[in-house]
């Protein structure tokens, strides 16, 4: 029996409503002033997504996001579930740009399913969300080897590999940090997805990183961070210390940016309201 990730009633209702709101969604889904699309990392709405995947996707489309990036749990979807989600994305006029994956998904045993689901969803990048294997320079070189090996299989299927940083990858001296090791030891086709907030918290300069790796920052997690007590990542876009104007300039003039992704780990507002406010602030800052 086909396993369903969402109820048939919810899917049918969402799909039925979508065509009537299509023009409104397109009007809301405006690109950045540069023409670069703005999406959302679905971890930002993780609680809503777990309860109602289809309804949550419709809400982020209604908010004006042009696309999205699914994270970890997507890997458990069957091909049929992925096809249902792709139909909804098409109905709403938005894209799945990429997915976040556990490092284990890049193994020879698991990469096949990742390829199948990502091809159905219509994405481009299969991103390693983090790695627990890296602890020494040699260990990080091994992570690079895994990415290179997986990228060959992904590229044969019309997909690309990527790596997403957290704090650990940007700690240490410039030139010997884990991210430096990954950048030097992965193929140029492996995307270096920059998480701005964690880079800053780790004490590194995200603008300098972009400039040091031209053409490889194809997507960027626009996550804010504040050093103020009890704030951290619980701030909206623009309420922290990230130098967004300089980041946009570097990303769009040499960085190789193809799409922006807003990510927020929690705030004083609901998940959906947070997503709406962050997108509005992004547009006000970027000039869209």
Locate predicted features.
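C-terminal helical cap(s) of enzyme catalytic domains, especially alpha/beta-barrels
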Residues: 272-287
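Acidic (Asp/Glu)-rich catalytic clusters
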Residues: 31-33, 57-62, 77-96, 110-122, ...
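Acidic-and-aromatic substrate-binding clefts and catalytic sites of carbohydrate-active enzymes
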Residues: 45-51, 71-81, 102-110, 133-141, ...
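Acidic/histidine-rich catalytic cores of soluble enzymes
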Residues: 67, 155-241
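Active-site acidic/histidine proton-transfer and metal-coordination neighborhood
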Residues: 15-16, 67, 74, 91-191, ...
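N-terminal secretory signal peptides and thylakoid transit peptides that target proteins
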Residues: 1-20
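C-terminal segment of N-terminal export signals and the immediately downstream linker at the start
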Residues: 25-51, 59
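Conserved, mostly hydrophobic/aromatic
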Residues: 40, 60, 68, 89, ...
């Amino acid at each position: 029996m086909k396993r369903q990730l969402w109820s048939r009633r919810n899917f049918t209702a969402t799909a039925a409503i979508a065509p009537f709101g299509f023009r409104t969604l397109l009007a809301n889904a405006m690109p950045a002033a540069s023409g670069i699309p703005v999406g959302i990392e679905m971890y930002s709405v993780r609680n809503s997504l777990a309860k109602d995947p289809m309804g949550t996707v419709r809400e982020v489309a209604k908010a004006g996001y042009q696309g999205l990036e699914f994270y970890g749990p997507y890997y458990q979807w069957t091909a049929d579930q992925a096809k249902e989600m792709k139909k909804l994305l098409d109905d709403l006029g938005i894209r799945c740009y990429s997915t976040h994956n556990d490092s284990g998904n890049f193994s020879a045993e698991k990469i096949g399913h990742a390829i199948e689901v990502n091809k159905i969803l219509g994405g481009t990048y299969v991103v390693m969300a983090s790695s627990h294997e890296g602890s020494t320079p040699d260990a990080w070189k091994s992570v690079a080897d895994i990415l290179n090996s997986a990228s060959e299989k992904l590229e044969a299927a019309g997909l690309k590999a990527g790596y997403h940083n957290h704090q650990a990858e940007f700690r240490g001296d410039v030139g010997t940090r884990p991210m430096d090791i990954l950048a030097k030891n992965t193929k140029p086709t492996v995307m270096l997805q920059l998480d701005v907030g964690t880079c800053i918290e780790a004490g590194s300069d995200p603008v300098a990183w972009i400039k040091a790796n031209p053409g490889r920052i194809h997507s960027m997690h626009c996550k804010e961070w504040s050093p103020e007590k009890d704030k951290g990542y619980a701030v909206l876009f623009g309420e922290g210390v990230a130098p967004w104007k300089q980041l946009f300039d570097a990303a769009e003039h040499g960085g190789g940016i193809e799409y922006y992704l807003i990510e927020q780990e929690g705030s004083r507002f609901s998940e959906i309201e947070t997503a709406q406010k962050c997108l509005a602030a992004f547009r006000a800052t970027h000039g869209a």
